[in-house]
Amino acid sequence: MKLSVAIPCLNEARTIEKAVGLARDLVAAAAGGDGEVVVGDNGSTDGSRERAEKAGARVAPADRRGYGFALLAAIQASKGDVVVMGDADATYDFREAAPLVEAVASGSCDLAMGSRLRGRIEKGAMPFLHRWLGTPVLSWLIRRFFGLRITDCNCGMRAFSRDAFERMHLVCGGMEFASEMLVKASLAGLRVAEFPVSLHRDLRTDRVPHLHTWRDGWRHLRFLLLFAPHVVFRLPGAVLCAVFGPVTLALCLGPVVVAGRLFDYHHLFYAVPLFCIGQQLLWFNAFATRFRRFAGLGGEPPARLPLERWLLAGFLAGLVGLAVFAGVLRDWWASGMGALFAVRRCSLALVLLLTGALSVMNALMTSMLELHFVSLHDPVSKPDSP
């Protein structure tokens, strides 16, 4: 087994040598010295690259800034059968990754995760919000949405096989790379295990952290929502449409009595918007499933949207709505433009118009995400061999 250790780096001159040294200790202990340390440099200007090379690492430049881009550069440049990733700030002791390497190398799992929450966290090593809010909530969402039994989705120390890396097709360049790895591991059917690791305090008190709590937390959450549209959009949308669609139709026809309680046109002011919100949530589900494929994030290909049918249905619904409105205006004109009670008919017309407009606009937008483009830099066909 050949072992590679991938370390992302951006201006970590004061700690990179220590991190590389710990990584080399891991290679010696877990792989008998058969391995390498590869640093993905994100454009450091403080001499980090030179210090990493001096410590015995090979440096792979990452052209684009970002945690994910730096790791991808290091992993793609590595040659090991098993890859360990960890940070350059020496807050992780790479020597603790030996059980992770053993689990992957033995075939008992494809991706071995570290867990700071199950291990030891030095005082001051992890911000309060990260430890008690951000990481637990995001980890719960991953357990709930994707069925992975993990406690620390943001732990930076992980080990995985080369085959697992290729099957995950990782593309995210920011901090959400950590969540992408877990989501795609689940979608690819990879076996994931978790091991306790320690988190040490960063002694450089004057260092500006690369991690931004709220911005990066939102990036993680946004990515998880994108890959769980069935829970976030489809389920609530279907419930709203199933409940308030019939309610809206019934109240547009007349008052309804349920269990001795009268429901009249006043309740249309709740039913109509909730029904329309339900429709839009279902369209958001269609957007999300198609955008994943459009952006190269993977996932199961959705059924193709019959654009022409949705356009026709939308236009027909809109025309019927306009016809109902026209009837109201005709009656109002016939009554001498005086007071006219037409709340039910106007509500029905409004629902039809909104449904038609939502169908047409969303169908057009969704169909755009189904287009396939050929890069101008890539040949459409390969030239014939001589």
Outline where the language-model segments fall.
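Cell-envelope/extracellular polymer assembly enzymes that use nucleotide-activated donors
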Residues: 2-4, 36, 180
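A conserved hydrophobic helix/loop-capping motif in glycosyltransferases and polysaccharide synthases
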Residues: 3-12, 19, 26, 40, ...
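Short, acidic, metal-binding catalytic loop of nucleotide-sugar glycosyltransferases
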Residues: 21-33
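A conserved acidic beta->alpha catalytic loop
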Residues: 38-49
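Acidic donor-binding/catalytic loop of UDP-sugar-dependent glycosyltransferases
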Residues: 47, 51, 88-103
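Acceptor/aglycone-binding surface of glycosyltransferases and processive sugar-polymer synthases
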Residues: 62-77, 82, 94-175, 202-223, ...
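Hydrophobic helical membrane-anchoring modules
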Residues: 170-386
